[in-house]
Regions:
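C-terminal beta-strand-rich structural cap/linker in extracellular carbohydrate-active enzymes
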Residues: 543-570
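Aromatic- and carboxylate-enriched substrate-binding clefts and catalytic-loop regions
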Residues: 210-404
Length: 570
């Protein structure tokens, strides 16, 4: 849809195009606008530049989802519409109900609403908080961010979550990548070669030189880059991805003048990505990764949304355009990575810009608690983090060596002395199809430890399709009874339709008859089920009957402080 304006005083005006996109198999609508400025033709007076001070790319008047007679805080979750755009930053573990690029407003023309104050927020507006203050010259165009509107079919939390997860798989299919990641805490070439060999032996798939490892992705020295280029080649020859870490925000830039010039920045300090330092920083990262042939990039502290009031930075003119410029710079880096097949680990919601994975429920102090507490917290974080994310969109954390504290009680090293705990962490994570940053000096320290790692890696890879499928929430971990989840894949052409994992935090055996919601597997009438034990062996199959709701009643038996699982087949 185009909006064209007649020339004024012989000078052509920009054209505004409105684009809509719909998608197969999911009720999602995408909308964006583009401002196109025709090229000045020969003999025509030079046209001026125009500034897109601000824009509203969408405005919807919604049916109020609830009647509020008196004032109270509005609950976004009651809407039957979910909105997200790719203009988002500053949200680590989940997407906030309202972003920097959209908001709900009061509709002043709605005078008959139930609320006495007439302040029911029922008009959705897609517009940036700042700017964008972008100038368009002849022959150029301006493209807004993309707004995505997902229409729910009901109020059930699980169904809404399934819709969200399908949306991400459709709009950002790279989020389905789910490699096994070893966070190496040293960057010495000799120990990295040992890590390559350990990953090759156990089946781990990527090595990230972690924070605190001593690796410097900002180095411009050719000799230094050559070292890691050779290591990346060796990793690739072993079938592994290889890359490193860099911190963007929550640090000082090269000079104080290169920091964001604003009051109360999110991390108290941080570089402006439109400053000279910020521009050189991103260029250096790209040069290093491309030269060395890296295939994974961990970017801590992506652009968090701070405006910058400096009028001296080369990348922006002032405060009004600073947010747009910095967001574009960060998103362009991830798109550049995506174009080259570089996997991006980033603790922020940059999925629609090319990011692969963010935190599932990451809090540093949690991984300094005693090991037994970490086991429960881990399952709680996975349960909570997979309502709106697929399992592959979130990473967890396993402190093989000490992290922020806690000493020997919080760490797994020496690994051979804590095999039961190491096994339990793999059961939590790979039983949920969730990858963690296994951070430490090594993956195994004995043949017994190596056997535990290989057992779980082989299990995950042998059942990868169903373990990476949608996760249905059964019972949240509370340390008082069983907890667990159910993976489901209703595809007609697959044999494994479901895989359920159950965990027992108690010191006594748990035996329960539970209702298993096999409706989500696409099966009707009956299902073939096989029991799995802690050695990951399967029993002979038995048949379970499904009622009209698609529910099967199944007895589960879980040994003390252990786990069991069920494989559901058609």
């Amino acid at each position: 849809m185009s909006y064209k304006h007649d020339a004024v005083d012989g000078k052509a005006l920009p054209t505004v195009d409105v684009y809509y996109e719909i998608y197969d198999g999911i009720p999602v609508l995408q909308k964006r606008i583009e401002v196109l400025y025709p090229q000045t033709v020969e003999g025509q007076e030079a046209a001026p530049e125009y500034c897109v001070d601000s824009f509203v790319s969408e405005e919807l008047r919604l049916v109020e989802p609830e009647s509020r007679v008196e004032e109270k805080e509005f609950n976004w979750n009651v809407l039957n519409l979910y909105v997200e755009n790719d203009y988002i930053y500053g949200y680590t573990m989940s997407c906030a109900p309202k972003g920097f690029g959209y908001r709900l407003e009061v509709e002043p023309e709605y005078r008959t609403q139930v609320c006495y104050r007439l302040d029911t927020p029922c008009r959705y507006v897609s517009t940036p908080e700042f700017g964008p203050a972008q100038y368009v010259r002849p022959g150029e165009n301006f493209v807004s961010y993309r707004s995505f509107e997902l229409f729910y079919d009901g109020t059930d939390r699980e169904r809404r979550g399934l819709a969200r997860r399908r949306m991400y798989r459709t709009l950002a299919p790279w989020t389905a990548e789910n490699p096994l990641m070893f966070h190496k805490t040293q960057a010495n070439p000799d120990v990295l070669r040992e890590a390559i060999e350990q990953c090759r032996e156990t089946g781990f798939e990527t090595i990230i030189m972690s924070f605190g490892s001593g690796f410097n992705l900002e180095s411009t020295e050719k000799a230094y880059r050559d070292i890691y280029r050779e290591l990346a080649d060796e990793a690739k020859a072993a079938g592994l991805g290889f890359g490193g870490y860099s911190l963007t925000s929550s640090r000082n830039a090269g000079t104080l003048e290169d920091n964001v010039q604003t009051e109360n920045p999110k991390f108290k300090r941080g570089p402006c990505l439109g400053a000279d330092w910020g521009q050189r920083y991103f260029a250096t990262l790209k040069e290093f990764m491309e030269y060395a042939g890296f295939s994974i990039f961990e970017n801590d502290g992506p652009y968090p949304g701070d405006p910058c009031e400096s009028e001296k930075h080369p990348g922006h003119r002032g405060k009004e355009d600073s947010v747009w410029v910095q967001w574009k710079a960060q998103g362009n880096l991830y798109r550049w990575c995506r174009e080259r097949g570089i996997y991006v680990n980033q603790p922020d919601w940059y999925f629609l810009n090319g990011g692969n994975k963010t935190g599932m429920g990451y809090r540093e102090t949690n991984w300094s608690l005693p090991r037994a507490e970490q086991v429960i917290i881990e399952r709680q974080n996975i349960y909570d983090g997979t309502w709106e994310k697929t399992a592959s969109m979130g990473w967890m954390f396993v402190p093989l060596s000490q992290y922020h504290g806690g000493g020997a009680a919080a760490t797994i090293e020496p690994l051979r002395e804590h095999l039961d705990h190491y096994d339990a962490r793999f059961a939590n994570l790979l039983g949920a199809g969730v990858q963690a940053c296994y951070r430490g000096p090594r993956l195994y320290d004995s043949e017994e430890t190596k056997a535990v790692v290989k057992k779980w890696v082989n299990f995950y890879k042998s059942r990868r399709q169903i373990l990476d499928a949608d996760l249905i929430h059964l019972r949240r971990a509370d340390g008082r009874d069983w907890d667990g989840w159910l993976h489901v894949d209703p595809s007609a052409d697959v044999e494994d339709r479901g895989l359920a994992f159950f965990y027992n935090p108690l010191k006594t055996e748990i035996v329960r008859e539970i209702e298993l919601p096999l409706y989500y597997t696409g099966l009707t009438g009956q299902a073939t089920i096989r029991r799995g034990d802690s050695d990951l062996n399967l029993s002979e199959p038995f048949v379970a009957q499904l009622d009209g709701r698609g529910v099967a009643k199944v007895e589960i038996r879980i040994a003390p402080e252990s786990y069991s699982w069920l494989l559901i087949q058609k």
